Amino acid sequence: WVERPIGEKKRRKAITRWRSSHQFLAECCKVGQPISRIIAVGASLELLAWRSPFLKKTLRSISHRYYISDTEVNHIAHNLALKSATHVIIPSHWDGSLDGGFIEQAQAKGIKIHRLDGLHGHVHLSPGIHANKVSNPPKVLVRLLKGDGIHDDDEVIEIPELTFDGLEITSANEDQYDGDAWLLDRQLAKHDGVITQSVTLASEAALLGTPTLLISKAKRGFLGRLQDDGYPLFCWNKSCDGDDWKNKLAQFLAGMHLTDAIETEPWPNARNQLAEFLSMQLID
């Protein structure tokens, strides 16, 4: 686990993280078989750790450096990846108009591009059948963001309290969830619906068949993919007021009672495809 270089003194945090990661990798290379590759999901700073932040010293055994991303607007991470990545893995629905020229630059530098047919959720989740019977009142999981992330500070839209009227709410707000945040996806299918400012949680909930209302200005290629594939995702990207907002909320509330009518595209074999990209053998 590494500290995210955000907020005050983020440059110092980044250098400290780079140095500690390099020292860790150097120690690992001294014990047993040297490390030959690094796989970074979104956190491209670790890809720099194959070389020292202060010296010209490099860990030459680390010849394969993979950068995996599904977030086109994470331009800072993309720019760091261009400095060290040898391979980039992005989804087939990647929207190049949002990535700041990242893929074009990666191709120009000779970085190998792999395109995954599916979302990240297709890799670590399993398709399930959502219960048709809705609780009374409906049980809805709500996740609100702090909005201080690298790329989400201008994406957050305030959700009025009236939105939750008549619902039994499970609060899972960022940094305030009482349970294990890494196991939050297991709670999604246990609820009748999800209301969230988080695009990641929205995608996971929709993939599991839970009707989801995403309230965010975020633009991601996978949001269009989910809607095109028939998943129960309702997106709202403006202020929560007016008749259009009331209609969208009504569509979501009605959607919780219509899960038996959901028809989605077949679940892609993204997990095996990713394993092939990484030259890994799955054990289950």
Segments predicted by a language model, with ranges:
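A donor-sugar binding/catalytic signature common to diverse glycosyltransferases
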Residues: 37-61, 65-70, 186-225
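C-terminal amphipathic helix plus adjacent low-complexity
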Residues: 254-284
